A protein has these predicted regions:
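PDZ/PDZ-like domain segments forming the peptide/carboxylate-binding groove
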Residues: 15-65, 137
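Cleft-lining beta-strand/loop regions that shape enzyme active-site pockets
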Residues: 6-8, 12, 35, 41, ...
């Protein structure tokens, strides 16, 4: 008869994780730095990455420009540190970055900042913009602080609840 199983222990999990640096690259030049996203692993005074830098190596491996750039940043586990080598107008620049698991919150914050700038530009700063990420007490307190410091001086208010994850403000 023997032993057989079709349980959870038989499942093989193949998972890759993306090591996010916060460095964004040009769409048409996938190894050329477009910018560095605010408050990410690469957005540190000690990390010297600038728009226009061209990625040459990741952890000592010379990049192949015909290969998908993301393959250099995806592994079964996160590296503790990534060493990136760039060409900056003929000068070699080497940086070490501690990658992060995700940049989703940073992208969300940038989206809010861009919305704020759009509202300011289109209304000549006469309409306030406030985004509440959720309905928790922390976000409610931020709203109250904004109301008392700045928003009350405006002619109108846009309270943006898009992508709000919910919560219990009423408690």
């Amino acid at each position: 008869q023997g032993f057989s199983s079709s349980g959870e222990e038989e499942t093989i999990r193949l998972v890759n994780r993306t090591m996010e640096t916060g460095i964004r690259f040009e769409n048409d030049k996938p190894y050329t730095v477009k910018d560095v996203l605010a408050n990410t692993a690469a957005d540190k005074k000690s990390i010297d990455v600038l728009p226009g830098d061209i990625l040459l190596k990741v952890n000592g491996e010379t990049v192949d420009i015909t290969k998908d750039r993301n393959s250099y940043f995806s592994k079964p586990s996160l590296d503790r540190e990534l060493q990136l080598v760039f060409n900056r107008n003929g000068k070699i620049v080497t940086v070490n970055i501690h990658p992060q698991r995700t940049i989703a919150p940073n992208l969300y914050d940038e989206w809010i900042k861009n919305n704020q700038a759009t509202v300011d530009a289109k209304t000549n700063k006469k309409v306030a913009y406030h985004n509440m990420k959720d309905m928790g007490l922390g976000e409610l307190e931020k709203f109250f602080i904004d109301m008392t410091q700045d928003l009350y001086q405006k002619d109108g208010l846009i309270l943006d609840l898009r992508y709000n994850t919910g919560g219990n403000v009423h408690d």
